[in-house]
């Protein structure tokens, strides 16, 4: 107990595989997983890089998972979440910023019951006046405005977190991990939960390590796991509430105009005796 072993890795993989199978069989509604030691899980022909990527591969249906960090009233997503620091400037594009900010907007609207969320986009450079801000971030924000996505910025991370600007927004898009996640954790008064956004399955997990050093001592804090469970339940209810009215929309009434072919809504022809 309290050490990494082949048996514990095999047991973790067996539990994950069972969870994937049971979800396909509609055996449960949400998945809450505990931390696992990634290096201890070995799958022939597949490199295990984390639970999020594994769930994406098994149940993503072609969608790419994006981690949403949740703490108190803060929700943060990372644009270049899998890129190393030295590659961030090369990975960052207008399409990536727009894609991630729009995903964050739609996720908060659907899964957190906020009808028109406000998204803050952080800058790459300390002055927010660099080439990346002028040629990538600002054009992306402009295009999102035209698509009715409420995105604002770019804000420097120091100014944004130091002055408490985060209180004015429903979601935050950081450009890389160290820019956003450490400040979020520092500001958190409780535990942080990770949610795998953009997947059909609702999957959450506490943002903590395996802590083999305290295994079996009954001193672990269960609040983070409890928070992950409650968050998954809330997201399930919000998503169901959001999707239900969209299941059977009323059909639109159109009539073709003979002169120019444009469709006119709700244009009902008069009766002959009128």
Spans of model-derived segments:
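Anion-binding alpha/beta catalytic cores of soluble intermediary-metabolism enzymes, centered on
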Residues: 1-274
């Amino acid at each position: 107990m309290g050490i990494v072993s082949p048996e514990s890795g095999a047991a973790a993989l067996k539990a994950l595989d069972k969870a994937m199978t049971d979800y396909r069989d509609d055996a449960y509604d949400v998945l809450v997983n505990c931390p696992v030691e990634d290096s201890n899980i070995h799958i022939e022909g597949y490199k295990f890089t984390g639970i999020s990527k594994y769930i994406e591969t098994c149940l993503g249906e072609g969608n790419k998972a994006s981690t949403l960090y949740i703490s108190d009233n803060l929700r943060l997503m990372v644009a270049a979440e899998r890129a190393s620091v030295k590659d961030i400037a090369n990975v960052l594009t207008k399409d990536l910023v727009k894609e991630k900010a729009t995903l964050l907007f739609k996720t908060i609207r659907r899964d957190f019951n906020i009808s028109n969320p406000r998204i803050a986009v952080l800058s790459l450079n300390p002055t927010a006046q660099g080439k990346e801000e002028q040629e990538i971030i600002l054009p992306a924000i402009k295009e999102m405005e035209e698509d009715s996505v409420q995105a604002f910025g770019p804000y420097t991370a120091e100014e944004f977190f130091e002055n408490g600007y985060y209180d004015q927004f429903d979601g935050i898009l950081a450009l890389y991990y160290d820019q956003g996640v450490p400040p979020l954790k520092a500001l958190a008064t409780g535990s942080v939960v990770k949610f795998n956004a953009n997947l059909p399955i609702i999957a959450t997990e506490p943002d903590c390590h395996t802590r083999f050093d305290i295994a079996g001592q009954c001193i672990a804090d269960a609040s983070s796991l409890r928070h992950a469970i409650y968050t998954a339940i809330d997201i399930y209810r919000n998503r169901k509430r959001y999707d239900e009215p969209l299941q059977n929309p009323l059909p639109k009434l159109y009539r073709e105009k003979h002169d120019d072919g444009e469709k006119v809504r709700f244009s009902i022809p008069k009766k002959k005796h009128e």
